[in-house]
Amino acid sequence: MKAESRHERIISAVTCAIALLSLAVFAGCRVNRAGNEHQKDQILYTVIGSDPRTFNPILVTDASSGQLTGDLFETLLQLNPVTTLPEPRLAEKWEIAPDNKTITLHLRRDVKWFDGQPFTAHDVLFTLDVIYDPKVPNSSRPVLLVDKKRIEAEAPDDYTVVLHLPKPFAPLIAALEGFQVIPAHILEPVWKAGDFNHAWGINTPPDQLIGSGIYKMARYSQSQVVNYVRNDSFWMKDEHGGQLPRLHGQNVTIVPDANAEYLRYLSGQIDVYGPRPEEVYPLQQKKDNHELDIQIEKIGVDTGTLFFSFNRNPRRYVKGGITDPKINWFTDLKFLQAMAHMVDKKSMIDLVFHGLAEPAVADISPENKIFANPNLKDYEYDPKLAADMLEAAGYHLVKPDVRTDPKGNRLEFDLTTNTGNPDRNEMCTIFKQDLERLGIKVNYRPLEFTTLVDKLDSSFDWDCILMGFTGGVEPNDGANFYRSSGNLHIWNPNQPTPATPWEAEIDTLLDQGASEMDITKRPPYYWKIQQILHDQLPIIETVRGQRYASWKNSLENYRPKVWGLYKSEWMEFKAD
């Protein structure tokens, strides 16, 4: 799981109407001109909601950095988003021994790094060494620990890697789908010098970012744009021997505001777009009325999770021998249950998602047909029940707008999410207003995304957050979120030992689920994890939106699926 960024809402109806009217006046010439330029140059124009925090794929913990480095580096395998089965990438084939403890990867021999050096098995072994280095903070290590041990690897030759597991590990193939290999000849000396954590930061000149992916980064201008050019030495060819990818490059503009992103799509400045719920019907109308030459398609339900979480980290609340009373509230199950009953999911669905969403009960999406727990009962929105629960637990309403804890401290905390995200802003506003009716003072302070991630990763200076994470087909890919020692276990990360019995139980269930090789016997372990999270409430689920994709008709072979783009290397613009 990786932290997910998007946008922010509240533009007045008048302002929006004026903006759209202005666009309508000159949209005709702009749309055609931009579209023709994109077709002529074979450059895909897109946007992203925030700046990256790093260009080092091993150190990525946020969605923006992950997206912007994703095309620079190749993985050993890849997920087919249609079949959800693994497919070859840097490893052209693989064999699993009968004991399920040895996997042999046969690597491609025609892959070169951007600087012309050959890709070899040594690069894979080096990448594993970096991931397992405790001095290198990364999200891959929890996913690749087997029985709390590293996977041992050897290279009999330059194009063969043999992985030796301490015991069978069902999620390994899925883990290799996200395993981005980095160049040993560039980064191994840096790692040995102890400076890997500073390598390839956002100030690194793009020509020094040496990958093996489909695109090279040509330019990064902070808070403005990222430009990519095609890797003309990329190993993949089409059925006629033509070079892939077919696009010659990408232009990714950094646009923190969703309304601005939408206007860019309407004006033809970007080629693909993930519409928000309130934009689906207007876009469909513009398509039907031939105002825009686009496609719009529902592709499924969000595969990620969007939740409120209260900070349980002692590093935030216990300092200099003084304990902030908030930690007592945020670890009190009665308090958390009351908070869960104050999440007005129906209003969020109706007002924020325009009916295009459903209540979320678990962190695993129902799109994951195998691992989503179908038996969980939702916490119904019930302010009276929540008030009664708080009173019974000693959180008394002492004035119409003031509620105190059992020791007389006023219930007051900060609530945050990332700026530039209208949907989350409105959800936080709904939650804040409802809690204040219970006498709980909520200080809502949205933060710029990179600042927010710094608070989650480093300072732990937050109380309550509305946060989203992406989801995958393999639940163990979220081990850095589930596991008590994980760096994305956001309510109390990087625990040396589990802080609670239920977190220890989740750690055990993760190990058991990962070692079960029979796919029909694995779901109960992850259903139980979802049940524990549902009962203990380190995260309070909100809603899960329907996902739509829209793109220009001039863009061919653009095939968005709920689990990702299908054969994105074949995308191209129609010739004029």
Predicted segments, located by residue:
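A structural "hinge/loop" feature
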Residues: 50-66, 90, 117, 172-182, ...
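Mature extracytoplasmic/periplasmic domains
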Residues: 188-191, 356-375, 548-551
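N-terminal lobe/hinge region of extracytoplasmic solute-binding protein
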Residues: 47-98, 129, 210, 214
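Bacterial N-terminal signal peptides that target proteins for export
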Residues: 4-16
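Bacterial N-terminal signal peptides
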Residues: 15-24
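Surface-exposed binding/hinge segments that line
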Residues: 95, 106, 141-193, 219-221
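Extracytoplasmic/periplasmic ligand-capture domains
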Residues: 8, 28-36, 82, 95, ...
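Active-site-proximal polar cores
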Residues: 542
